[in-house]
Design a protein with these regions (language model features):
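Glycine-rich "HGGG/HGxG" loop immediately N-terminal to the catalytic nucleophile
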Residues: 52-53, 75-88
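Conserved alpha/beta-hydrolase
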Residues: 63-81
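Conserved acidic catalytic loop of the alpha/beta-hydrolase fold
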Residues: 92-112
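Conserved hydrolase catalytic core segment
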Residues: 110-153
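Alpha/beta-hydrolase
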Residues: 160, 165-248, 255
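Short beta-strand/loop motif that positions the catalytic acidic residue
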Residues: 253, 259-261, 265
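Catalytic histidine-centered segment of alpha/beta-hydrolase-like enzymes
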Residues: 293-302, 306
Length: 318
């Protein structure tokens, strides 16, 4: 196994970066933890193709309590760099994620796996839970996507901007029914919303770009692969995402279900997430608002996230 990050100091620590064979292609995986018997935190990134493996500082912080697993999905990041193969559909990514889950179970026998789905990854991870629920000890949703996410965000922004003529005029250029928005219009609205909330970290400028430029060992070739993967993956599966039937998300699960929600999230606003959360039946469920954060709340406020994760989830799986 290729190792390009320094090992952690704990005796039973693990620090691995490399390609693993997953459903016919080589896919990039990073695993880092200070104790191999700790629960695994398997992170399903958003996007499409917005890899989180560059967030090494935040996830190294998480690795004090969990063994953190990052996976650059088919068509994303360093997996795209190795071979520019696109997913046929969302189920392809679900299948890949479940195949990697089996490998993790083999590599860490008897260790619990906590699945975390973020943004678009919350759709993929939700489907993974439905298709292999017994593989996971708990499901954590951050930036949970729902059918009403964009509409509620738009309605709230329009209300907040009613005293500002120019802002209202710009918003009125968008169709009122957010379900009809194109990917370009969604991106435009997200940028507009972020500019209205400068008191919280901006997903693009403060989180993605900063970490892309400073991630350990990330080079220009890998950076370009990240960008090209974003474009290619969007072309491949965005039509399915645009028409996704959110009734496919589970309404009942037999494992603990915890949601982390950014206090000022422009893409998955609190009201939309709360509505879905209220519908779900689970043996244990909790929704936690992450203060002073927008989208990617667990990277915006990693200390708060880890403290709450340890408090809410660790006792349930120990």
């Amino acid at each position: 196994m290729k190792k390009s990050m320094p090992r952690l100091t704990a005796k039973n620590a693990i620090s691995f970066q490399g390609y693993l064979p997953i459903n016919g292609i080589q896919q990039w995986v990073q695993i880092e933890g200070q104790e191999t018997t700790n629960p695994l935190l398997f992170i399903i990134h958003g996007g499409p193709a917005s890899t989180y493996s560059m967030f090494t500082e935040a996830t190294r912080f998480f690795s004090t309590t969990f063994t953190v697993v990052h996976w650059d999905q088919r068509g994303a990041g360093k997996t795209y760099l190795k071979q520019p193969v696109m997913p046929d559909n969302l189920q392809t990514l679900v299948n890949d994620g479940l195949a990697l889950t089996k490998q993790l179970k083999g590599a860490f026998p008897g260790v619990q796996i906590v699945l975390l789905g973020s943004s678009i990854g919350s759709i993929i991870a939700n489907l993974m839970v439905q298709q292999a629920e017994s593989s996971f000890a708990a499901y954590i949703a951050t930036e949970q996507m729902t059918s009403r996410s964009h509409q509620i965000a738009f309605n709230q922004t329009l209300f907040d901007s009613k005293k500002h003529v120019l802002k209202t005029a710009w918003l009125n250029k968008l169709p009122y029914a957010a379900s009809t928005w194109s990917a370009k219009q969604i991106a435009q609205f997200t940028i507009f919303f972020a500019l209205q909330h400068t008191d919280v970290p901006n997903m693009v400028t403060d989180l993605f770009i900063k970490n892309l430029l400073h991630a350990y060992g990330l080079n220009i070739k890998a950076w370009l692969a990240f960008c090209r993967g974003l474009i290619a993956s969007r072309q491949a599966i965005q039509p399915e995402l645009d028409s996704f039937d959110y009734n496919r998300l589970f309404s009942k699960t037999s494992i603990p279900f915890v949601v982390f929600q950014g206090s000022h999230d422009p893409i998955t606003p609190t009201a939309a997430t709360q509505a879905y959360f209220n519908q779900v039946q689970a043996p244990y469920k909790r929704m936690i608002i992450v203060p002073n954060s927008g989208h990617l709340c667990f990277f915006s406020n990693p200390k708060f996230f880890l403290a709450e994760l340890t408090k809410q989830v660790t006792p349930l799986i120990s």
